Curated annotation (Swiss-Prot):
SUPFAM superfamilies: Anticodon-binding domain of a subclass of class I aminoacyl-tRNA synthetases (SSF47323), Nucleotidylyl transferase (SSF52374), ValRS/IleRS/LeuRS editing domain (SSF50677). It comes from Chlamydia trachomatis serovar L2 (strain ATCC VR-902B / DSM 19102 / 434/Bu). NCBIfam families: leuS_bact (TIGR00396). Keywords: Aminoacyl-tRNA synthetase, ATP-binding, Cytoplasm, Ligase, Nucleotide-binding, Protein biosynthesis. This is Leucine--tRNA ligase. It is found in: Cytoplasm. One of its GO terms (molecular function) is leucine-tRNA ligase activity.
Length: 819
């Protein structure tokens, strides 16, 4: 019989849908397992090969766990708010909702074609009013706890996009989306007080089964540092400086302030005002990431003022430097060029003194003056001495600082959750009541922003202006919207109870499903989505509305998918199919030599692969199998369409084997042993997420199994059940072909019996006068006489014409003939 995925895959996809095979149930008699993908933004580009790696991995685990008797929750939804749909609306006039719905429909079609086993009954999009009603409600919980507030903030503002951007949305002073110039501005913004949970966020990492690299990234992002605050007196008040190295205080040769520091105007002398103003203007075009990037030179400008050193009382020049950020410490640093590489670059750039106060062993030197004696001290002893001195003289104190800053939450966009707040003229505001949610945005035609710092909602006067019946006052709705991160902060909780109209989730359902047992997604979310979701979850935990302190028990980051790219140097990329190899070199159709590399798949590099084309040619099961076979889940991997073809050939062989007339009711030990060993290897691989080893295990199995004269039916059925998580369509077809009722998952996961895992043969060595002459595979229970006879036969040419004086027999190890 012939294997034709085009005939069987759609059939089984309809069966799963009609039978609701993947519908999750809160069954208290079963152990739960919650396996989740980082849900996608439904872009117009649709599903790409990078999605396939993570989605196939979670699907394999979900299918295996269901077969093993777990109650499995494996859902999918859509992170559907965001800037791309809004920018498309500005260009075309198409409502973002229309674009989003179209893209979601395309994504769903592609996911279905891959045979992923999602519980479709729990599907939602973050842009559904039924969903963001609860996003708004959860925001108000943060607001009521004092964790959401408004403040004037220095932000990255893109005039062309008309909105605030995060550091991650900027590259080299330009927006990632569109490549428009970005500048720094002070704007009134909504902010979430994530810093209030800095310690909990740090401590919680210790309990998580996450990649160490991700945990370290979050630790660095939070950036907890112990040190001291030091006050440097000036004519206009003290400058507070935070330092982690108070032991180097005597080595200070300059102070550097952030351009946004509140004392800059007061400290700038008349002679320096023009150059300082120009420097600050230039700084406004840089993102914070650009400002702190490693560079061989540092920029800065002198204020014309000096501060008094708290110990030596010497005058220290005060500079402005863009590498100093207001968000960390106090927005001022003490420059110690001899013991800080960044300070040294700055000092060399502007010819400032370099004073060494530590020797090579880290012991203080040149650090004594009246009433202050550091020489000879080192490490914590020196730091504590300085802190004690500062505190006793009211010049500073011990302090803990964090790099983490409160989360800028406002966006000047239309396509986002409206913030459910009414403002009044006296500066007060009122959060909307539950019965006023969801707050829907108005239908508009013009999606362009309204002036600096105002989103398109500000233009809809009839929506903005309201008479508040609760306070009997005229008010204005908030016109900022939430960032795309808001909806993804809690979506995993909504999946527990996706269509509850009375609450974001029912307590008993959250208690049953949480935490997420396995969460798979890209490492690029390490310090944004993952940190923000943990923050919201810990707020909810303190509020008593979730039962676990952390949302995601185990995290796995899938590696990048690479593909070969072909580029004409100085001109650009060409399509791979147009490149050809001549005389050991790759050339373009024009004859120009190509730069050939393995790079991340992307549209810009023309090396992307459309999964649907692969499905149409090879079938979804072959694509799924190769997605795992291509390399370890967490490592980068090079994609090869030839590899997909190879997996298709394997599935052809497997289909032929199962449909062969050699499949019979038989208890052949060797066949059963091969099947039990296969199941054991597959089970272990899924448990360890070593999914790339599974195709190899099947290939080894089939190579040995087809050598049998008879294929034991029970062994074949075990192999089909073990293949089902990886290649579900062909497994369903073969399961029925073997005479079983539809639904291979219902048959359970095959049990492995120890007696079939034990090797039934041993290899012994055959020697003549101590020299190796042969190796012999024998049954473990063979008698001494049988072994000696077989050994004599295998070494017969070395024994010919010789008298065997003695045969030394060591069971299961060797036979040595002495002649």
């Amino acid at each position: 019989m012939r294997y034709d995925p085009g005939l069987i895959e759609e059939k089984w996809q309809k069966f799963w849908k009609n039978e609701q095979v993947f519908k999750a149930e809160e069954d208290e008699t079963k152990t739960k397992y919650y396996v989740l993908d980082m849900f996608p933004y439904p872009s117009g580009a649709g599903l790409h090969v990078g999605h396939l790696i993570g989605y196939t991995a979670t699907d394999i685990v979900a299918r295996c766990k269901r077969a093993q008797g777990f109650s499995v929750l494996h859902p999918m939804g859509w992170d559907s708010f965001g800037l791309p749909a809004e920018q498309y609306a500005i260009r075309t006039g198409t409502h973002p909702r229309e674009t989003t719905e179209k893209n979601i429909a395309n994504f769903k079609k592609q996911l279905t074609a891959m045979g992923f086993s999602y519980d479709e009954s729990r599907e939602f999009a973050t842009s559904d009013p039924e969903y963001y009603k609860w996003t708004q409600k959860l925001f108000l919980i943060l607001y009521e706890k004092g964790l959401a507030y408004m403040a004037d903030m220095a932000v990255n503002y893109c005039p062309e996009l008309g909105t605030v951007l995060s550091n991650e949305e900027i590259e080299n002073g330009f927006s990632v989306d569109g490549g428009y110039p970005v500048e720094r501005r002070m704007l009134r913004q909504w902010v979430l007080r994530i810093t209030a949970f800095a310690d909990q966020l740090l401590e919680g990492l210790d309990e998580l089964d996450w990649p160490e690299s991700v945990k370290q990234l979050q630790k660095n992002w939070i950036g907890k540092s112990s040190g001291a605050s030091v006050n440097f007196a000036t004519e206009h008040g003290a400058i507070e400086v935070f330092t982690t190295r108070p032991d180097t205080l005597i080595g200070v040769s300059f102070l550097a302030l952030a351009p946004e520091h509140p004392l800059v105007d007061l400290l700038t002398s008349d002679e320096q005002k023009a150059v300082v103003a120009q420097y600050i203007k230039e700084t406004q075009s840089k993102s914070e990431r650009d400002r702190i990037s490693e560079m061989k030179t540092k920029s800065g400008v002198f204020t014309g003022s000096y501060a008094k050193h708290p110990v030596t009382h010497e005058l220290i020049p005060i500079w402005i430097a863009d590498y100093v950020l207001m968000g960390f410490g106090s927005g001022a640093v003490m420059g110690v060029p001899a013991h800080d590489e960044r300070d040294l670059l700055f000092a060399e750039q502007f010819n400032l003194p370099v004073v060494s106060v530590l020797n090579e062993e880290g012991v203080c030197i040149n650090s004594c003056c009246e009433g202050f004696h550091l020489d000879g001290l080192s490490g914590e002893e020196a730091k504590q001495y300085v802190i004690n001195f500062l505190e006793e003289n009211h010049l500073g104190a011990a302090k803990i600082a964090y790099k983490l800053r409160d989360w800028l939450f406002s966006r000047q966009r239309y396509w986002g959750e409206p913030i459910p707040i009414i403002h009044f003229e006296d500066g007060s505001c009122r959060p909307l009541r539950d019965d006023e949610l969801p707050l829907l945005p108005p239908e508009i035609q013009d999606y362009r922003p309204e002036g600096v710092g105002q989103g398109p909602l500000a233009k809809v006067r009839e929506w903005v202006q309201v008479f508040d019946t609760e306070t009997q006052r005229a008010g204005k709705r908030e016109t900022h919207t939430m960032p795309q991160w808001a909806g993804s902060c809690w979506y995993y909780l909504r999946f527990c109870d996706a269509h509850n109209s009375a609450a974001p989730w029912a307590k008993e359902k959250e208690q049953y499903w949480m935490p997420v047992d396995l969460y798979i997604g890209g490492a690029e979310h390490a310090v944004l989505h993952l940190l923000y979701a943990r923050f919201w979850h810990q707020v909810f935990y303190e509020a008593g509305i979730v039962s676990t302190p952390e949302p995601f028990k185990k995290l796995v980051n899938q590696g990048l998918v690479l593909a070969t790219s072909y580029r004409i140097p100085g001109k650009g990329y060409i399509y791979p199919e147009t490149a050809k190899e001549e005389n050991g070199k790759w050339v373009a159709p024009s004859g120009e030599e190509l730069d050939v590399r393995q790079e991340k798949m992307s549209k810009s590099k023309l090396n992307g692969v459309d999964p649907q084309i692969l499905i149409d040619e090879f079938g979804a099961d072959a694509v799924r199998m190769y997605a795992m076979f291509s390399g370890p889940l967490d490592k980068n991997k090079l994609w090869s369409n030839q590899g997909v073809a190879g997996c298709r050939r394997f599935l052809n062989r497997f289909y032929e084997m199962v449909s062969s007339d050699r499949v019979k009711e038989d208890n052949n030990f060797e066949g059963l042993s091969l099947a039990h060993k296969l199941v054991q290897r597959v089970t272990d691989a899924i448990e360890k997420l070593s999914l790339n080893t599974i195709p190899s295990s099947f290939m080894e199995f089939i190579n040995d199994f087809v050598k049998l004269a008879v294929y034991p039916k029970s062994a074949v059925e075990m192999a089909v059940r073990a293949l089902a998580p990886i290649a579900p369509h062909i497994s369903e077809e073969l399961w029925v072909l073997l005479g079983n009722s539809p639904g291979v998952q219902k048959s359970g996961w095959p049990s492995v019996l120890p007696e079939y895992l034990e090797e039934q043969t041993v290899t012994i060595v055959v020697q003549v006068n101590g020299k190796l002459r042969a190796r012999l595979d024998i049954m473990k229970d063979a008698s001494k006489e049988e072994v000696l006879a077989l050994a004599r036969e295998s070494a017969s040419k070395y024994l010919e014409g010789c008298e065997v004086k003695k045969a030394i027999f060591v069971p299961a190890r060797l036979v040595n003939f002495v002649v």
